[in-house]
C-alpha cells in the first residue's frame, strides 16, 4: 500500500504540469527508462550508465540533423571506440525523422539493457507497447541505413552503442561482475548481534541477511550481497580527463578521478575519544539517530526561510571546521535559509514541523529517490519536474530563444546523463580503492570495544566510542538495559532509533527512540536492506546530487526552482514504508537546486548511511563534475569543438587566482581577442570585458562573495571556455 501511494504522491504534481504541453519523444522514452530502473536491481552505477548511454543515443539521433550541433558517437572515436557513419540524406520532415531514429534506437538499446532484469517480462512488454503505439514495426531490424532508412539508422546507432558497451570497462556481458575485488572483513550477521570487534575498522564489511531486498523491492539472489562496482573507475566516462586520473593499487589497480585523499582511520585515543575525527564522525551518525521519533517535541522550520542557503565556501576542510559545520546534538548544518523569494519578492512562509517527522521523511525520500530510480534517476525526475513547471522558460542557460520541447529535453538529458555517469565512474572508483567502513559496522565495532573517554571508568578501550551525555553513556546497575543479572553493566548504550526489532507491522507500528545497547544500533532503513552493498567513502548521494544541482543551475541559468521553490508532499501516515508516518503531513521545500542537494546529503546522515567525511568530499567532487559535464556538452551543442580540440583549448586558458578578491587574471595563448562575460550563479551578467592580451587582469569591485562563471567567446561569438570562479 505504501509503495503505490508514494508513486501517486510524487506523480500528482507532474501530471498537473504534463497536461499543459505535449511531451517530446525523448521525454517519453526517458520515462520508459525510469520505470524500467524502478523494476530492476538497484545498481546506481549501472543505471547512471544506462541514463547516459540512452541520452547519448537520443542526442546523436537529434544532432545528426542539426546544422550546428556536433555528434558525439556517430562518425567519431568515443572512448577508444570508432563508430563509422557515412551520413544520411537530409529529410523533408526533420521532426518525423528524429522521432523515428530516436524510437528505434531507444527500443533496441533499452530492450538489450533490460533483457535480464528481474522485471524483464513487464519491462520489455512496456517497451514494445510504447514503440508500437507510434505505429513502428518491431520486426524491422535492419541496420543498413544506406538507403535512407531512418529506422535502420536508429537500429544501427543502438547496435553500435551496444557494441561500445561491451568493451567500455563495465563488464556488461558478464553481468557487471567484479574481477579483482574481495572484501577484507567477514560478513556481519545483523540479527545475531554478534561480537564485531575483530574486524578491520577502516575497511568495508559485507552484511549477511536471511533475505536481502534491494531498494527497488527485488529479492537479491545472494544473502550476502557482493560489493557493487568496486572497479567502476575503469569505465569510459563522458567529461572526465586524464589529468584528473590516478591509477592506484590497494590489492588491484583502481582508476580514481578527483582523488579526495584518504578518509580518517581510528586512533588509539588516550582519553580523547571525542577529538578523534573517526570517532566524532561516526558517533555523530549515532547522535542524529536520536532525532527519529515523532514523539520528540522539537519543532523546526523546514521552509526555505529556515533551512538551506549553504555557501560552497562554507564547506569544511579541517576537522575543526567539520565540527562547526554539523550540529552534533541538534542536527543540521549552518544554512541560514533565504529571506526573500526572488520571484515573488515576498518572504518564504515558515513551515514548522516535528524534527522527528522531517528527519524520517528526508531519510526515506532521498534514499529511494523517490521510488527507486536510484540517485542518478532521481535527478532525472527532478529535471522532468522542472521541465514540466508552468513557469519554466526553456531557454538554454536562461538565454536566447525558447527551445522546442525536444531540443530542450535532448540537451538537458545529455548534460545531466553525462554528469551522473561521471559521478558513478568517479565515486565508485574511490569507493573501490579506499574500501571504507559504513556506520553500521563502525558503530557496532566501537560499541563492542567500549568507551574511549576516561580510563578511570569501566570498559575503557582506545577504540571505543566517546561518551556524550544524553547520547552515548555507560550502562549502570538498575538501568533497564542492565539485564536480569547485571550482565550489561559497564557496556555502551546509545540514545537512538530502536530499530526493526520493534516494528511488527510497518503500516501501524513506530519503533521510536530510546536507549539501546550500542552493539544493537541500526541505520534508519528497512531490515532487509539496512545499508547499500558497497563502501561508504565517498557518498554517491552527495556526489550525484551536487552534480545534478550544478547541471540544473547551468541549464536553466537560474539557481532557483521555477517560482522560487520546488516541493514534495509527504501525507500523514501514508509516506513512510518501514514504519508508520509521518505523524503529520509535511512538504519538503527547496528554494534552490543546491538546497535540494544539501538536503539529500544530510538525509544520509539521519538515515545512518554516511558520516560527514563521506558527505562533504562527495559534494565537492559533484560540483566539479557538474560544471565539467556542462562545459563539454555545450561544446557539442555549439558544434565548434571536437573532444580533443576542446581539451586543448581548455588547457591553454586559465584563470587565477581562485578564489579571487578584487581581480583575476585570464591567461590564454589564442591568437585573437576574447570576449569575457562574468555571470552570477542565477545567470545574470555582472561584468563584460574584452581580453586583448595574454595575462590580462580583470578588475571587479563591489561584488558579493560567491560562485560565478566566466564565459569566453571568440570573434565569431563561439564559446571557447566556461570556467567557474569563486569570489572570496
Positions of predicted regions on the chain:
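Sec-dependent signal peptide recognition
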Residues: 2-10
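Short alpha-helical segments used as structural interaction elements across diverse proteins
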Residues: 3, 15, 46, 601, ...
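Residue-level signal for alpha-helical transmembrane segments in multi-pass membrane proteins
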Residues: 12-19, 62
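C-terminal outer-membrane/trafficking sorting elements
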Residues: 15-18, 644-728
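Acidic/polar surface patches and capping/hinge elements
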Residues: 22-639
Amino acid at each position: 500500500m505504501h509503495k503505490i501511494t508514494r508513486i501517486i504522491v510524487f506523480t500528482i504534481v507532474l501530471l498537473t504540469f504534463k497536461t499543459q504541453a505535449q511531451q517530446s519523444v525523448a521525454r517519453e522514452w526517458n520515462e520508459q527508462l525510469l520505470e524500467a530502473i524502478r523494476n530492476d536491481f538497484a545498481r546506481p552505477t549501472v543505471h547512471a550508465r544506462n541514463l547516459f548511454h540512452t541520452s547519448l543515443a537520443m542526442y546523436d539521433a537529434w544532432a545528426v540533423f542539426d546544422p550546428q550541433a556536433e555528434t558525439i558517437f556517430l562518425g567519431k572515436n568515443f572512448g577508444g571506440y570508432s563508430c563509422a557513419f557515412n551520413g544520411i540524406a537530409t529529410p523533408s520532415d526533420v521532426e518525423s525523422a528524429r522521432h523515428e531514429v530516436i524510437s528505434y534506437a531507444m527500443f533496441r538499446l533499452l530492450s538489450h539493457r533490460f533483457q535480464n532484469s528481474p522485471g524483464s517480462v513487464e519491462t520489455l512488454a512496456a517497451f514494445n507497447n510504447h514503440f508500437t503505439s507510434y505505429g513502428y514495426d518491431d520486426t524491422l531490424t535492419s541496420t543498413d541505413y544506406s538507403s535512407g532508412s531512418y529506422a535502420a539508422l536508429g537500429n544501427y546507432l543502438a547496435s553500435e552503442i551496444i557494441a561500445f558497451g561491451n568493451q567500455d570497462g563495465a563488464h556488461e556481458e558478464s553481468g557487471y561482475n567484479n574481477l579483482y575485488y574481495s572484501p577484507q572483513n567477514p560478513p556481519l550477521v545483523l540479527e545475531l548481534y554478534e561480537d564485531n570487534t575483530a574486524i578491520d575498522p577502516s575497511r568495508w564489511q559485507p552484511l549477511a541477511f536471511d533475505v536481502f531486498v534491494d531498494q527497488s523491492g527485488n529479492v537479491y539472489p545472494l544473502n550476502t550481497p557482493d560489493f557493487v562496482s568496486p572497479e567502476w573507475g575503469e569505465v569510459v566516462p563522458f567529461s572526465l580527463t586524464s589529468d584528473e586520473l590516478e591509477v592506484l593499487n590497494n590489492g588491484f589497480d583502481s582508476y580514481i578521478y578527483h582523488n579526495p585523499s584518504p578518509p580518517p582511520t581510528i586512533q588509539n585515543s588516550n582519553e580523547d575519544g571525542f577529538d578523534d575525527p573517526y570517532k566524532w564522525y561516526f558517533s555523530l551518525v549515532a547522535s542524529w539517530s536520536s532525532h527519529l521519533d515523532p514523539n520528540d517535541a522539537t519543532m523546526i522550520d523546514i521552509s526555505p526561510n529556515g533551512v538551506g542557503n549553504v555557501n560552497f565556501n562554507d564547506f569544511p576542510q579541517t576537522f575543526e571546521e567539520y565540527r562547526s559545520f554539523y550540529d552534533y546534538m541538534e542536527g543540521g548544518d549552518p544554512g541560514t535559509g533565504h529571506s526573500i523569494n526572488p520571484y515573488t519578492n515576498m518572504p518564504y512562509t515558515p513551515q514548522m514541523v516535528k524534527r522527528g517527522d522531517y528527519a524520517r521523511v528526508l531519510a526515506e525520500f532521498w534514499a529511494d529517490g523517490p521510488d527507486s530510480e536510484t540517485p542518478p534517476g532521481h535527478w532525472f525526475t527532478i529535471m522532468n519536474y522542472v521541465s514540466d513547471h508552468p513557469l519554466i522558460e526553456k531557454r538554454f542557460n536562461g538565454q536566447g530563444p525558447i527551445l522546442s520541447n525536444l531540443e530542450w529535453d535532448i540537451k538537458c538529458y545529455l548534460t545531466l546523463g553525462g554528469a551522473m555517469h561521471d559521478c558513478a565512474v568517479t565515486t565508485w572508483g574511490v569507493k573501490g580503492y579506499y574500501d571504507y567502513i559504513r556506520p553500521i559496522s563502525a558503530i557496532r565495532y566501537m560499541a563492542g570495544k567500549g568507551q574511549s573517554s576516561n580510563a578511570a571508568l569501566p570498559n575503557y578501550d582506545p577504540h571505543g566510542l566517546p561518551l556524550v551525555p544524553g547520547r552515548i553513556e555507560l550502562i549502570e546497575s538498575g538501568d533497564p538495559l542492565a539485564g536480569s543479572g547485571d550482565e550489561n553493566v559497564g557496556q555502551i548504550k546509545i540514545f537512538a532509533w530502536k530499530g526493526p526489532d520493534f516494528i511488527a507491522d510497518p503500516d501501524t507500528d513506530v519503533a521510536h527512540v530510546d536507549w539501546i545497547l550500542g552493539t544493537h544500533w541500526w541505520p534508519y532503513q528497512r531490515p532487509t536492506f539496512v545499508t547499500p552493498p558497497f563502501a561508504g567513502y565517498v557518498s554517491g548521494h552527495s556526489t550525484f546530487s551536487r552534480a545534478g544541482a550544478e547541471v540544473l543551475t547551468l541549464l536553466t541559468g537560474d539557481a532557483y526552482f521555477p517560482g522560487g521553490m520546488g516541493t514534495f508532499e509527504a501525507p500523514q501516515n501514508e509516506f513512510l514504508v518501514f514504519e508508520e508516518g509521518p505523524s503529520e503531513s509535511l512538504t519538503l521545500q527547496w528554494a534552490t537546486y543546491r538546497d535540494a542537494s544539501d538536503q539529500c546529503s544530510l538525509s544520509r546522515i539521519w538515515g545512518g548511511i554516511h558520516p560527514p567525511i563521506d558527505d562533504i568530499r562527495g559534494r565537492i567532487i559533484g560540483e566539479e563534475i557538474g560544471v565539467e559535464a556542462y562545459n563539454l556538452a555545450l561544446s557539442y551543442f555549439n558544434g565548434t569543438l571536437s573532444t580533443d580540440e576542446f581539451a586543448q583549448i581548455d588547457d591553454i586558458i586559465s584563470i587565477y587566482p581562485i578564489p579571487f578578491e578584487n581581480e583575476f587574471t585570464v591567461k590564454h595563448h589564442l591568437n585573437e581577442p576574447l570576449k569575457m562575460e562574468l555571470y552570477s550563479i542565477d545567470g545574470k551578467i555582472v561584468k563584460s570585458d574584452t581580453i586583448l592580451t595574454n595575462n590580462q587582469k580583470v578588475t571587479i569591485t563591489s561584488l558579493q562573495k560567491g560562485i560565478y562563471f566566466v564565459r569566453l567567446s571568440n570573434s565569431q561569438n563561439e564559446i571557447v571556455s566556461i570556467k567557474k570562479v569563486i569570489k572570496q
